[in-house]
Amino acid sequence: MKTSDILLLPTVLLTFLFHNCFAQAEPDLVVATRLGRVQGTRLPVPDRSHVIAFLGIPYAEPPIGKRRFKRAEPKKPWNNVFEAKEFSNACYQFVDTSYPGFPGIEMWNPNRVMSEDCLYLNVWVPPTPRPQNLTVMVWIYGGGFYSGSSSLDVYDGRYLAYTEKVVVVSMNYRVGAFGFLALNGSSDAPGNVGLYDQRLALQWVQENIHFFGGNPKQVTIFGESAGAASVGMHVLSPDSRPLFTRAILQSGVPNTPWATVTFDEARRRTTKLGKLVGCTWGNDTELIDCLRNKHPQELIDQEWQVLPWSSLFRFSFVPVVDGVFFPDTPDAMISSGNFKYTQILLGVNQDEGSYFLLYGAPGFSKDNESLISREDFLESVKMGVPHANDIGLEAVILQYTDWMDENNGQKNRDAMDDIVGDQNVICPLQHFAKSYAQYAALHAQSSAAAPGTLGWGNSGPTGYNSGNSHGAVYLYLFDHRASNLAWPEWMGVIHGYEIEFVFGLPLEKRLNYTAEEEKLSRRIMRYWANFARTGNPNVNTDGTMDSRRRWPQFSANEQKHVGLNTEPMKVHKGLRTQFCALWNRFLPRLLNITDNIDDVERQWKVEFHRWSSYMMHWKSQFDHYSKQERCTDL
C-alpha cells in the first residue's frame, strides 16, 4: 500500500462513520409510505426548535399531454427514496401584474416555476419523538379557482404544526381552464378535475398520513375563499364525505354566486376560449385536442375574455354542477340538508369586498382614498350585480344609499365595499350557516331516526362515520387590521388577511407584527386546532375549557358569533341580518318576478321605483326640517 493511501485511510473511514452516524441519528427524516420512501427536511421555528417538513410529495401522475383537462390518475409507486425537501412546481395560472413589485399583490402570485406537472402535496410534522394519532389539518388554498399555490409563504404550515402539535397538510390542485374547463358528455373534459385533484389528495391522506404520525380518522379540511368553497363542496359531495371529519370555511361557501356555473354556461365559455385561441372547427373531441396542443400561457392569456359580462368577483373557469360530484346545485343540496353531518367552523372578514373593487370598479385605486362620485357608484353597482335587471339594481341602490348624504364619496366607497362583500361572501355564508344549523337542530330532535334521515349523509363508499354524535356550527367575524398591512387604510380588514393569523406568521419576529398580534395568532391557532381535535373551539387538548368567555354555538334563531381581534372576546348576534335579507330572500324573488315582464311594464316599474325612492328621500328631508328649531317671532 502506498504511503498516500495510508494517509487517506483515516479520512475515508471518518467520512464513512460520519455519514453512517448521521443517517442513524435522523431516521425521522425518512418515511415509508404506500407508494415509496420519502425524505424530508428540518425547518426552524421560533424557540430555537424545528419541525420536520416533507415538501413536494407526488400524489398523482402528471396531468400532461393527453391528460390535460382529464381527471388525474393516482401516483404509481417508486423504488428509490424521493427527496421531499423543496416545494414542487406551481400549477399554471394567471399571474397578477396590476401592481408590479407591490407586496400586497406579489404575496399571492406563484413563487415557484409553473408547470402542468404540479400535483404534489406537503406535510409538516411536529419534532421527534415521532408522534402517533395526531390530529390532521388539510389546507386547500383559494384564488378564485384561477390561481393559488401551496408553496406561498402565507401558507407555511410549520408554525401551526409546531405550536398546536398537529400534522398540517397542503396540496396543489389545477386551476383555471386546466382544472375547470368542461364540456357536458365529454370524458376528455368532464369538468371539476381541480376538485377531483383535491379529493385524490384527501384519499392519499387517508392511506398514508398514519406513516407520518397523523390519525386518518381525525382529519379537518380548511380553506379560504375558493378554498373554503372547495371545502364546502366536499361537505356536499357524497363521495368526499368519508375522507374527512370536520370542516373550516374561511370567507367562502359552495353556494356563493361565483363558485359554480351550469353545464350550458361552461360549454359556452369553453367554446369561446377555443375561438379566442384559434380552435374553431370540428366536434368536441377535435376542440379538446386543439386546446390540448396549445401552450398553457395561450389559454391563460385569453381566460378572462370568456366571461359573459364585465363584472366584479366573477371568474372564468369554476366548478360545474355535473350531476356526479354535485348531485344537485349547491343551493338545492343545502336547502334540503343533503350534506355531511359534522361540526363546522366558518366566518368572514370585516371588509370582504374592498380588494375586488380595485379590479375594474370606476374610481377605485390603492394609491388614494378612493372617494367615489355618485356617478361612479351607480356604474360600480352595475358591475357588482351583473345578473340583476334595472329593478333589481334599484333595490340594491335603495338599500345601500344614505339618502341624507348620497353624494358623500366616502359613504359611496364603503357602500360598494359592502355590496360586493355582502353579495359574494358574507350573505351566502350566513345562509349556509343558518341552513346547516337548522338541520343540526332537526337531527338532534330526531336522533333515534335511521342513518341518512333528513339528508344527513355521512356515509360514502366506505360507510365511514365521523364518530361525533352531534353537529355544531361556530361562526366568527375577523375584524383586526394587521399593523404591517401594505394596502391602504380605506380597504379595512381585507379578504384573505386572516390567513396569516391562522398559520401563525406573527410568531416570526422578523415580520414585524406586534406582541398583541402574536397573542391573537396563538389564540386563533388554538381555536382552529381545538376545533379540529374535538369539534369545539373551546375545548383544549387536555379536555379543559378556557376560563375566558367561551365561543357559543351558532343557531338559526340567535345567530351568535364572536369577533376575532386583539380585544377580549365579545359575542354578537346577527351577521348583517338586514342586508342579507336583501341578497338571500328579497332580491332573488324580485328578479324571479320581474324577469318575466315585458319592456313597457318593466320600464313603468323602474320609474315607479325611482319615484318611491324620491318620495322617501323627500320625506326624510322634510322630517329633518321639521325637527329643526322654528324661527321665533320678530
From Swiss-Prot:
At the top level of its lineage, which domain of life is listed? Eukaryota
Q: Where in the cell is it found?
A: Synapse; Secreted; Cell membrane
Signal peptide interval: 1-23
Q: Which reaction does it catalyse?
A: acetylcholine + H2O = choline + acetate + H(+)
The active site is formed by S225 (acyl-ester intermediate), E352 (charge relay system), H495 (charge relay system)
UniProt-listed Enzyme Commission number(s): 3.1.1.7
Q: Which InterPro entries match?
A: AB_hydrolase_fold, AChE-related_enzymes, AChE_tetra, CarbesteraseB, Carboxylesterase_B_AS, Carboxylesterase_B_CS, Cholinesterase
Chief localization = other
GO molecular function per UniProt:
acetylcholinesterase activity
Give the record's keywords alphabetically.
Answer: Cell membrane, Disulfide bond, Glycoprotein, Hydrolase, Membrane, Neurotransmitter degradation, Secreted, Serine esterase, Signal, Synapse
Which cysteine residues pair off into disulfide bonds?
Answer: C91-C118, C279-C290, C427-C580
GO CC, one annotated term: synapse
Per the record, membrane topology reads: Peripheral membrane protein
- The residues that carry sugar chains are N133, N184, N283, N368, N512, N592
- Which Pfam families does the entry link to? AChE_tetra (PF08674), COesterase (PF00135)
> One biological process GO term for this chain?
cellular response to methanol
Q: How does it assemble?
A: Dimers and collagen-tailed forms, in which catalytic tetramers are associated with anchoring proteins that attach them to the basal lamina or to cell membranes. In the collagen-tailed forms, subunits are associated with a specific collagen, COLQ, which triggers the formation of isoform T tetramers from dimers.
Extra remark beyond the main annotation: No other isoforms exist. This protein corresponds to the T isoform in other species.
Record's PANTHER family?
ACETYLCHOLINESTERASE
> What family is this protein classified in?
Belongs to the type-B carboxylesterase/lipase family.
Function recorded in the entry: Terminates signal transduction at the neuromuscular junction by rapid hydrolysis of the acetylcholine released into the synaptic cleft.
This chain's protein is named: Acetylcholinesterase
Q: Which organism is it from?
A: Danio rerio (Zebrafish)
